[in-house]
Amino acid sequence: MNFLSDLPLLLLSLPVVLMALSVHESAHGYAAYKLGDPTARSLGRITLNPIKHFDLFGFLSMLVFHIGWAKPVPINSRYFKKPRRDFAIVGAAGPLSNICLAVINLLLLRIVMFFVNNAYLNHTLPTDIWLTVLSLVVYILYVGIAMNIILAIFNLIPIPPFDGSRIFYAFLPQKWYFGVMRYEQYIMIGCIILFFGLSYLGLNPLGAIENWLINGLFKITGMGGGTQELGLFNYLLSHLGNLVYVA
């Protein structure tokens, strides 16, 4: 990625990224609160205010590498009646909230593209400034889909400190649970080395899963490969890209 040339599009992505991270962490806090833990609520972390959840490095990583995080919501397990089960529920709440946001953005994009397609067929597709506004709306909705899916997939990795580890541990037999917990730091380091090793070799399993999911969602909503709406969608994105890079 050429960071400077992509900077305008990255700036357009800011509200979407902040919303995705804020919803994710708020979902953790809300789930914990409903299960009896008031910690997140007492610290004001059940909120969509991005300042409360902001982590500079996680935010920049999300923009540049599409892999990021927010400031973790504190959880006190002593309030839980069934700690392993409740930790799993709290862990799942974050990724599930991002999946819901991705679906909402997809439905909104589908509605917008329905009207765009009708305008194209009736030769009333807007030009000049209105075409740019329409392109911006489509781009932001698409980023909302992509960023939320990435955040959900990334956090479902079943290794600490990701949310997937909390879900995974809930299904481990008791005798294995403490053994895995003992070595979780080494497991995390090993997985990080593996991830960067695959990236160095040009392999991106998370990106492949992301593309597969987005393509699948597009097909479900009638925007699969070869459709006129997909062609118009790509046209609007290219129009915005041309404006950004020419500027």
Predicted regions and their residues:
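Hydrophobic transmembrane alpha-helices and their immediate loop junctions
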Residues: 1-247
